[in-house]
């Protein structure tokens, strides 16, 4: 039976500000990427999200981002490889502390937003992030954009890697995600998301916005927890995968 992980970015509320539909989505996914305070999240949100994931048997992941609360970590910043290493160690270490306090362990690390996209193309940043994950815990799985520098860096560091694809994002001909600054960056209908996911998982390819077919591996599928259609996408994507005989399970 084919198998794929279904992940969601979670714990992105901050103080009195609520983001996402974590409570409803948590039972639908197999792994959760929990914000660690730099782009979103705070200590209480981190703890509560981790506890909710544990209660549902969902694999725990750290979701480190750039220090940009106002921009939600989605704006590029000029950071050195050493700064990227330090940011990842700091944030993963914070969530690992909550995991230890709860008597559980982290399963994976997935960078967030601009840090994720920068590391997909910048070898030095990718290597620094992979090294940070390895130095914290070499058993952690590194999630990265399928076919990206981050996936290769993880392999080079001796880590297990999960090639990630996106249910709600469109793709360019080089396999990169369409920039969020473009009007066609996001898929708007459930039907489009379901069809794209099934094609990526069963055929290992995706159709770019320019019409070309792009080959890719699909170990894990991302649902963005802050997306307008996140709950609907998660519900229908999960149902379609199960109907197609695909088992939903963390790596």
Curated annotation (Swiss-Prot):
Keywords: ATP-binding, Hydrolase, Nucleotide-binding
Source domain of life: Bacteria
Family, similarity comment: Belongs to the LamB/PxpA family.
UniProt key word Transcription: no
EC number(s) stated in the UniProt entry for this protein: 3.5.2.9
GO molecular function, one term: 5-oxoprolinase (ATP-hydrolyzing) activity
Role description: Catalyzes the cleavage of 5-oxoproline to form L-glutamate coupled to the hydrolysis of ATP to ADP and inorganic phosphate.
Gene3D superfamilies hit by this protein: Glycoside hydrolase/deacetylase
UniProt-recorded name of the protein: 5-oxoprolinase subunit A
Any one biological process term the GO annotation gives: carbohydrate metabolic process
EC class name: hydrolase
The protein's assembly and partners: Forms a complex composed of PxpA, PxpB and PxpC.
KW Hydrolase (keyword) present: yes
Catalyses which reaction(s): 5-oxo-L-proline + ATP + 2 H2O = L-glutamate + ADP + phosphate + H(+)
NCBIfam families, A to Z: PRK05406.1-3, PRK05406.1-5
């Amino acid at each position: 039976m084919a198998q794929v992980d279904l992940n969601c970015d979670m714990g992105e509320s901050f103080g009195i500000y609520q983001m996402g539909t974590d409570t409803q989505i948590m039972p639908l996914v197999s792994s959760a990427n929990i914000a660690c305070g730099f782009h979103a999240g705070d200590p209480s949100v981190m703890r509560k999200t981790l506890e909710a994931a544990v209660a549902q048997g969902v694999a725990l992941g750290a979701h480190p981002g750039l220090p940009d609360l106002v921009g939600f970590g989605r704006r590029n910043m000029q950071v050195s490889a050493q700064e990227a290493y330090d940011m990842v160690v700091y944030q993963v270490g914070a969530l690992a502390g909550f995991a230890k306090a709860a008597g559980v362990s982290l399963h994976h690390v997935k960078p967030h937003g601009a840090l994720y996209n920068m590391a997909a193309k910048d070898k030095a940043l990718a290597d620094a992030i992979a090294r940070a994950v390895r130095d914290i815990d070499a058993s952690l799985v590194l999630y990265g954009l399928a076919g990206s520098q981050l996936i290769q860096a993880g392999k080079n560091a001796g880590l297990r890697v999960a090639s990630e694809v996106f249910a709600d994002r469109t793709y360019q001909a080089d396999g990169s995600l369409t920039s969020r600054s473009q009007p066609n960056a996001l898929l708007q209908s459930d039907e489009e998301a379901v069809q794209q996911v099934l094609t990526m998982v069963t055929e290992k390819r995706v159709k770019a916005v320019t019409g070309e077919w792009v080959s890719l591996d699909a170990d894990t599928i991302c649902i963005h927890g802050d997306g307008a259609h996140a709950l609907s996408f998660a519900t229908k994507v999960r149902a379609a995968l199960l109907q197609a005989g695909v088992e939903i399970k963390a790596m």
